[in-house]
């Protein structure tokens, strides 16, 4: 520790940090401490705090244990900063704030307020957090939320002020003075601008655009970046903390509340989003803000972080202007109006701009780009179909006592055959208290404990009853007819499962037997990979809901029902996004809703070459999603599209499937289902492929074809027969009726134009056999 008034050198300036995780489940090893580990990485990152982790500990949600650790780290270890994670909510055992209040000597309410304000900009549930920040001696204590995402965001909210706060506590006079001098040199914020004279909305927007450009030039000259009003945008403060590296804050679209931006379109230009809410240049970090500590001298970078939070003149930009000024995805605004130009129909593509991708490459790409989801702790009864994220160990022996394998008599093997007195009985669920002596036996039932003195069991079939009680209710004497050997028909302790044995390995896909095994070993809570949530929508102006009466030019939507049922058949939770018209604004709004609520979004229609097929443009222009492929060399399903979008470090998966009913179902089985299986942690998510014989001749197509078929087994034949479902036109949903397989037919060549009845082919299983 530095003495009072001591001038710290660069070496002395190293910040010593402790990370304290408060969690019952982590303490009992039922969950991994993701937030604590992540905070350690953030603290040590040289482009962030650049601190040293001097202490790390996990404690249960107990006030005394929390207090004891905090006091020890403050008074004995003399840490500069303590970050706690967990226990700040409303649950009965969330007591971290109470423990902190009993330890600190002075409060730091500004830091708690900064975290609350930042959290409320992210989610209204931020109001349920109860952080306490304060000082004990020369140690700063900060309460952070228990989730990895929440703790990282709150750490980022207070990060710009942390180095200066610690310098103040350590009396680092020179560094404190440098910061204060830098702040004194800052110009005062200008007064609020007068509202423009009342004109037409279009004129008002144009005036504001000019005004923004002038203000931007002034800011460039002064080197001071503006900050946006916290109530005007949902862009988190994490995006404003320009020195957070992309490796920690994943690039992605920031979600705006849909009422945040007012959008208008001028007659003279295409319908592009024009944001009229007050959006400042803080949305787009300037080079001044992006500067990292190792690229500047002294404390300039730290002062720059403080400058970015001072009030400045707000500016107004259209969404397209904001996006053009921002190169990173953190600052893309997802508004409710699309920037896709729908007016120039004559200039649309006549040939697809997307290259043809082979089926193998497309499938590999999907699996490579699809992440495995995080974990959660569930009750074992809810484990059907889930994948274990941790090994499961037995905490007891099974059986926990020597148990009888059969109904019969517990005997002493050394006594041999002969007549024996019966001293009682041992039943399952009871522990016998008597000891079998020479010349005695005890009647036992299957699964019952073996009494002391006995070392074998003779089944009832190998005995004769010699004597019974007068009323016939008791056996008094029995004759043993065989020679028993020691251990005969006895399951010793731990015979089935030994204490500490791994009974289920990480990655196990749980079924009924695994659920029963968990019950057997008494493990009622297990850590599993999360199920992906899947949102499904159909696109097309021609579509009606199934319950609607047909109208001229309309058809009923079958894709959504079929896709939802397919996903639900595999056990995944779904969200029905309904029917979306062929309009970029509607598509964008529906995609935004799906992105905010689900892990995977499935659309059908709007991906081919029609003049109303806008989906790929919305993904590219509005969402800035990465489209990995837009056409696949296969039949059916040529225009199948796969895209990903990273938001706040979370990857969203988007499958834009063809609109033809059969194409949608086939591509869902080929691409979507394996991706979902990978997301839930299944080690081999590939579909099941078997061999089958063709029941009829099949003509080949120039493209690899997935031909719908019904698999049946004939008596005493090892391979099933694959019967075609008939006409394979992609619009004919009847071809999917009763189909439980897809014939994987090769493309046509000069030598092979068809396959003949009886030939063996590969078949992908898509239904119950």
From Swiss-Prot:
One Pfam family per UniProt: MoeA_C
Disordered: annotated span: 181-232, 260-299
GO molecular function annotation: ATP binding; cytoskeletal protein binding; identical protein binding; metal ion binding; molybdopterin adenylyltransferase activity; molybdopterin molybdotransferase activity
Reaction(s) the record says it catalyses: molybdopterin + ATP + H(+) = adenylyl-molybdopterin + diphosphate; adenylyl-molybdopterin + molybdate = Mo-molybdopterin + AMP + H(+)
PROSITE patterns: MOCF_BIOSYNTHESIS_1, MOCF_BIOSYNTHESIS_2
Region listing for MPT Mo-transferase, in residue ranges: 14-153
Family the UniProt entry places it in: In the N-terminal section; belongs to the MoaB/Mog family.
Protein name as it appears in the record: Gephyrin
Gene: Gphn
């Amino acid at each position: 520790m530095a003495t009072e008034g001591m001038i710290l050198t660069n070496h002395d300036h190293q910040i010593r940090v402790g990370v304290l995780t408060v969690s019952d489940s982590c303490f009992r090893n039922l969950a991994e401490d993701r937030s604590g580990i992540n905070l350690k990485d953030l603290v040590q990152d040289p482009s962030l705090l650049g601190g040293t982790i001097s202490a790390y500990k996990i404690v249960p949600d107990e006030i005394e244990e929390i207090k004891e650790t905090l006091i020890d780290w403050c008074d004995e270890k003399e840490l500069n900063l303590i970050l706690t994670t967990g226990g700040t909510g409303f649950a009965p055992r969330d007591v971290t704030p109470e423990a902190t209040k009993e330890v600190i000597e002075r409060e730091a309410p500004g830091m708690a307020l900064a975290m609350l304000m930042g959290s409320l900009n992210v989610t209204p549930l931020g109001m349920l957090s109860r952080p306490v920040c304060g000082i004990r001696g020369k140690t700063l204590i900060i309460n952070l939320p228990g989730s990895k995402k929440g703790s990282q965001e709150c750490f980022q909210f207070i990060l710009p002020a942390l180095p200066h706060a610690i310098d103040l506590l350590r009396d680092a006079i020179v560094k404190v003075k440098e910061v204060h001098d830098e702040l004194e040199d800052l110009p005062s914020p200008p007064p609020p601008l007068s509202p423009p004279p009342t004109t037409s909305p279009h004129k008002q927007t144009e005036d504001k655009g000019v005004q923004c450009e002038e203000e931007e030039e002034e800011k460039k000259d002064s080197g001071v970046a503006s900050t946006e009003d916290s109530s005007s945008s949902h862009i988190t403060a994490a995006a404003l903390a320009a020195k957070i590296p992309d490796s920690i804050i994943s690039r992605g679209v920031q979600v705006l509340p849909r009422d945040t931006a007012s959008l208008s379109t001028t007659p003279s230009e295409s319908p592009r989003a024009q944001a009229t809410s007050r959006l400042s240049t803080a949305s787009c970090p300037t080079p001044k803000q992006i500067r990292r500590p190792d690229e500047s001298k002294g404390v300039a970078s730290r002062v720059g972080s403080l400058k970015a939070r001072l009030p400045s003149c707000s500016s107004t930009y259209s969404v397209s202007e904001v996006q053009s000024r921002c190169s990173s995805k953190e600052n893309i605004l997802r508004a409710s109006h699309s920037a896709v130009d729908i007016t120039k129909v004559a200039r649309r593509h006549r040939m697809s701009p997307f290259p043809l991708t082979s089926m193998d490459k497309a499938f590999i790409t999907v699996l490579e780009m699809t992440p495995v989801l995080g974990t959660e702790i569930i009750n074992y009864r809810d484990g059907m179909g889930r994948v274990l994220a941790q090994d499961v160990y037995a905490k007891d022996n099974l059986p926990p006592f020597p148990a009888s394998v059969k109904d019969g008599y517990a005997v002493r093997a050394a006594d041999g055959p002969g007549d024996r007195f019966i001293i009682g009985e041992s039943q399952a669920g009871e522990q016998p208290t008597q000891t079998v002596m020479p010349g005695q036996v005890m009647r036992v039932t299957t699964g019952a404990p073996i009494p002391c003195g006995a070392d074998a069991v003779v089944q009832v079939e190998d005995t004769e009853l010699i004597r019974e009680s007068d009323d016939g209710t008791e056996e008094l004497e029995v004759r043993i007819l065989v020679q028993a050997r020691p251990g005969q028909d006895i399951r010793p302790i731990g015979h089935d499962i030994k204490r500490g044995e791994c009974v289920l390995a990480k990655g196990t896909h749980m079924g009924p037997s695994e659920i029963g095994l968990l019950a057997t070993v008494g493990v009622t809570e297990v850590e599993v990979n999360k199920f992906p949530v899947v949102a499904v929508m159909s696109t097309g102006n021609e579509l009606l809901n199934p319950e609607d009466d047909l109208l001229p030019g309309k058809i009923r939507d079958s894709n959504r029902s079929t896709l939802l049922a397919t996903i639900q058949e595999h056990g995944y939770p779904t969200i029905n996004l309904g029917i979306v018209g062929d309009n970029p604004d509607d598509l964008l709004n529906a995609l935004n809703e799906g992105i905010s609520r689900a892990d995977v979004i499935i659309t059908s229609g709007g991906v081919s070459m029609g003049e109303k097929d806008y989906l790929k443009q919305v993904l590219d222009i509005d969402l800035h999603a990465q489209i990995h492929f837009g056409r696949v060399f296969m039949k059916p399903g040529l225009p199948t599209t796969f895209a990903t979008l990273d938001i706040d470090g979370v990857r969203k998966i988007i499958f834009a499937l063809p609109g033809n009913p059969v194409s949608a179902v086939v591509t869902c089985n080929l691409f979507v289902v394996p991706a979902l299986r990978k997301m839930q942690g299944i080690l081999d998510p590939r579909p099941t492929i078997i061999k089958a014989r063709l029941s009829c001749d099949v003509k080949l197509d120039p493209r690899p074809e997935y031909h719908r078929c019904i698999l049946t087994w004939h008596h005493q034949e090892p391979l099933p027969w694959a019967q075609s479902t008939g006409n394979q036109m992609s619009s004919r949903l009847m071809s999917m009726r009763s189909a439980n397989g897809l014939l994987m037919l090769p493309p046509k060549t000069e030598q092979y134009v068809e396959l003949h009845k009886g030939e063996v082919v590969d078949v992908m299983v898509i239904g119950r056999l």
